[in-house]
Amino acid sequence: MGKYRTFRLAAIQAAPVFFDLDASTRKACRLIAEAGKQGATIAAFSETWLPGYPFFVWGSSKDPQLQWKAAADYLANSAEIPGPTTDQLCKAAKKARIDVVIGMVERDKDSQGTVYCTLLFIGREG
């Protein structure tokens, strides 16, 4: 086997600010900066980190009104790609000189409510 490039991975073990895309994005940017300062070359967040994925969103709740409100909040806090959320994440990755992998709920700009579980990869160039 040949030589392989080594890397330092920051596995982000932090919760987002559920149903608050803006606050979660700011938190992600802080965590990206911290990972870069600690020498990581890749920061990896979990699936649907933005805006989080509370288990009750799609039916675990016994209260239908709460379930519908949670689903509406979930949709409202999803992000279009590209958009302001990805712009902020790209700037943070570039400033920290770190690759970023983050799971996010992507809202389809051409539909009324379609979302995708997207894994976004941002290079250290932003």
What are these regions (language model features)?
Residues M1-K3:
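Eukaryotic N-terminal low-complexity, Ser/Thr- and Lys/Arg-rich leader segments
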Residues L21, R30-R124:
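Cys-nucleophile CN-hydrolase/nitrilase-fold catalytic domain and related Cys-dependent amidase chemistry
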Residues T6-P16, T118:
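Active-site-proximal beta-strand elements of phosphoester/diester hydrolases
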Residues Q13-R30:
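N-terminal phosphate-binding loop and adjacent alpha-helix
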